């Protein structure tokens, strides 16, 4: 057997072994082969149909743990039709076995070289869900026909969440680091700005969204100050989503590194971390909370899970100097 044939045989054997491993992982994640009853219960809960799990915990807040000034600002949400549709679509996609095997194989090969975001952009997968159209309108306290001039979505990813907000704005601007995600944003006709150019355009934005970006930023306080300076005075608003617990890390070339400016938020519960973000971050840079809510931060799944879920705190922030009512 020549060296080329041997290498080919070894590669085919590796692929077959890898596929078999993925199938066994998928099988084990069903919970049948997990002996520990606590772990098994947790995994079954994460993979179960929406009708069989308690989704109210995705939105639950204990107001007694919030500081007094924040309590009347909390907006209670619940599972709605758009959120359900995203989860059900993710569950369906996770059953496409050969597609998921292909995704997993490509991710394994590329992950040492490029970020997971870029891999997802290349594969056309990994869409995120932060809020529905109705939840966005309720959070910003606007009517369905409300329209403003400019939206800027920082770190827009594939533009899925941008698309939810876009109908309320005449012009939609986005930023993104990943080259593959940039291509997807251009296909959706959003106006792409450089990551260091959006605050130097010569105009202000009515709304800037910074969704699950603050904990992936090397200089988060500087970012917040730049956002504050870039909003329309008086009526401009920042929509800020942060994963709770707040744990800042940067993904660089497939590696995770600690940011230069590290923010540590005190508190163990969702409510205590909301208090911490408000007092230790937002107020320090000149923002105050106008409204906030608890929402699930959802991502399309893979061969192991139907979908991924993190706890989000989503805020509407205004400049502390603003004396004008909300839009």
Map each language-model feature to its residues.
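Conserved acidic residues
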Residues: 149, 170, 206
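Class I SAM-dependent methyltransferase SAM/SAH-binding core
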Residues: 152, 157-199
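N-terminal accessory regions of S-adenosyl-L-methionine
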Residues: 2-147, 160, 242, 250-327
